[in-house]
Amino acid sequence: MHFKFFAVTAALSLAAAASAQTASQPPVFTPEAFRSHVAFLGDDLLEGRDAGSRGYELGALYVATQFEGLGLKPGGADGWYQQVPFLQHKLVDGAGSVTIGGKSFANRSAVLVAPSPIEGAQAVEAPVVFVGYGIDSTALGMDDYKGLDVKGKIVAMFGGTPKGLPSDVAAHTNSDKRRMAAAKGAVGIIMLRSAEESARRPWARMTQGGNDPALTWLGPDGQPFSAAPGIRARATLDTPAAEALFAGAPRSFAQIQAEAATKGPIKGFALKPKVRIDQTSSVTRTTSPNVLGIIPGSDPALANEYVLLMAHLDGLGVHEAEGDDKIHNGAMDNSTGVATLLEVARAMQESGNRPKRSILLAAVTAEEDGLQGAQYLARNPVLGDGKVVGVVNLDMPVLLYDFQDVIAFGAEHSTMGKFVESAAAKIGIKLSGDPLPQEGLFTRSDHYRFVQEGIPAVFLMTGFANGGEEKFTGFLGTDYHKPTDDLKLPFDWKAGAKFAQINYLIASEIANAPEAPRWYSDSFFGKTLAPKAAKATR
């Protein structure tokens, strides 16, 4: 196995060197080069590249040696690596329960209890306040906590947001609700399921994941990071437990569900039963690296401004509960993204024209565990006096067809959209709107961790034109996050080369532009996450 790894690495390094372009010639993107990266990273040898596993370490070594062979500079304090320390935590034997007014519900019956990064038995008992959707946002004019005292209490809320918000704003707001609850002084969160969510995702599917461990990265003080300090317990309730929680309330759970289906914000109120959430977690420490390489900028005035190109290297690993094929190879998700990253790096090095701004290339860990590696990189920068001014994220292009259009998530919020338009036009690619707004994709990949820090970002998805809808949705329904996401899929490797080319053009335009990317003055994300940053007008 080691022989196979080093033989492939050496062969690809020689191939990269042999294909060097004459200075100033436009770089060539080939299906063969793109496929070579996916073929290695998606091989059974890497066992699905789960963060912290040996397979992931092999993938990280592959990327690092590719960076070295291309002549990049190491970007981490540990050479090519930024080691990310993690706590891996899970419920002991799946143990956990929620007691509502004296009635106990075992974990996975009608409740799901979240593990804690604090080892040992934990219990949180407190009164409960229903807070509607649990949103407190001045920017949106919403305050579900108005008139409610939740300090020291558990808050119960519906997932999601009221209807009518733009999909990306809704997804961001939903992801920020833990922080909002903590800011109000709550000690626990109970998530309720709307009738729509229950129909879309039955409880049996909610409990399929078993007792998979969660990851939380550790800060410099050795403590687990939390965006919601003070929240000590979390649980999700199915309908029987939710009905018990609303016993004796001014409105029943069924009435509240009906309101959620038809109305905007829902007025909250205190609930009668006291609730106790019990769980016992085991904790182990592990590390997993982000792999970082740098192409220094050629303009001394701009070289401290970095364009970040990022792709997650991790996958889902090996799942013993699966059938004969237990390995989640992650060929599409996200060997293709890493292949794009490597091909863009090669093209930039071989073009003979260094970009004016510097380029930080990052293959990050633990995306599948909640965008953890990207968040660690965003909050633990490696650039000294330099700063990231824009992010181009590369995550799971579905390469089963000759795509003719792309969706550029985030493009409408900043001047990065102009670079995407220009790059796409150069190779005859059209831009399309989001065909899957219900998925909230803008907040579900690594670039979002930099958006949260106030940095503009774009993330390209292959579009639905030219038969793409059938191929894309078919992959999501049949192969996404399954062992069948492997090299047996009918990849269109020419599409992979084209995807690398468009991202190369986008990154190059950003890196060589007179001005760094700016949020638009009317962008929700610019106003709320980068209020002091200079803005652009449309």
Q: Where are the regions that the model predicts?
A:
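Second-shell loop/turn segments in exported
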Residues: 22-28, 44-54, 69, 96, ...
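Soluble metallo-hydrolase cores and metallopeptidase-like ectodomains found primarily
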Residues: 104-147, 224-330, 346, 350
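His/Asp/Glu-rich mid-to-C-terminal helical/loop segments that flank catalytic regions of hydrolases
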Residues: 346, 350, 461, 467-529
